[in-house]
Swiss-Prot record:
Gene3D superfamilies registered for this protein in UniProt: P-loop containing nucleotide triphosphate hydrolases
GO cellular component terms attached to this protein's record: cytoplasm
E.C. numbers: 2.7.1.24
Name of the protein this chain belongs to: Dephospho-CoA kinase
A GO term, aspect molecular function: ATP binding
Compartmental location: Cytoplasm
Sites where the protein binds ATP: A26, S27, G28, K29, T30, S31
Lineage: Bacteria, Bacillati, Cyanobacteriota, Cyanophyceae, Synechococcales
Main location: cytoplasm
Amino acid sequence: MRVSKANALKRWKGSQRRIGITGGIASGKTSIGKYIESVKNTPILDADMFSREALTANQTIKDTIINRYGRTIVDKENTNSKTINRAALGEIIFHDKNERIWLENLLHPIIEKRFEEELEKHKLSSTIVLIIPLLFEANFTYLCSEVWLIYCSLDEQYERLMKRDGLNKEQAKYRIEAQLPLESKKILSDHIIDNTNKLDLSYPQVEVLL
């Protein structure tokens, strides 16, 4: 996966501190974000939340996806509705790079717009946190004044992902390899939080940066 270094190094230059949190899947991004929220009472904007919002509430997006993949990705427990089964959708996009790119091209403009809307709402906040798993891949670094990478070892990443989502190793592998490698993200980030072990050991690193 190629990422433009010039785009990856773009940063927000305004007075508001915008902490962009990224990292690999199951690296602990959300946990670190929640910790910052608890100690700093800082607004949190989450790309995954905006993505879920689009898949559940945006009828145009839902219709577009269903028209492409058919009713195989509609929730089987509620087949009369147009509720998208995210697990079924994941099985498609994590096994086919072209389908993943198609879905990202569909969702990323929606997610970007939601970030811009929420940033405008919180423009008077001195600090705000943006949790964006595909921060570099989606070229969203321009939204952030600084980028923190939440890092963990590959073995730990596999273990957490398999346990969290009930995946086998092959399924976890497809998901991990769909993202830019953590080692590449380290080079493009401003700060690195090592979250390989217990979260309690990561919090002091966060405190130093805050």
